[in-house]
Amino acid sequence: MMMDILMYLFETYIHSDSELQVDQDELEDELLRAGFHQDDIYKALHWLEDLAALQDTENQAAITMCSNTSMRIYTSREISRINMECRGFLLFLEQINVLTTEIREMVIDRVMGLETSEFELDDLKWIILMVLFNVPGNESAYTQMEELLYTKEQGILH
């Protein structure tokens, strides 16, 4: 599954501070040895390329800043992928200033870029972490999100 590959790559190379300059062929071979399917590997690598492309100013035309008082209206396609719990979590992260509206849109873009029929809150948390890691200047938000990901809900957050 594509999400499993993304989590594997994130934990192995990014989160562990391993060598980030890995040859793509070596990476594909490693993922094949780890038991992932070739087709899923290509999809995951393409997904990561699209994530990196969101940083390109030419590609940000669809992802623009909007007012903090504006309300995000989801399309029917987005609603079918991002359930109410996930949408509520995105709103919560905006309210506590972990996500900006721009980063929220990047997250939604990457969620919609997944080829999966099953998507739940834990998957969303990983996607948010990956997006925050990819956007420079969000170290504090990344740390907050990391704490939310690695700490199981232990009551109400203050």
Curated annotation (Swiss-Prot):
Coiled-coil annotated spans: none
One protein family per Pfam: DUF494
InterPro entries documented for this protein: Smg
Domain of life per record: Bacteria
HAMAP family: Smg (MF_00598)
Family: Belongs to the Smg family.
Protein name: Protein Smg homolog
Lineage: Bacteria, Pseudomonadati, Pseudomonadota, Gammaproteobacteria, Vibrionales
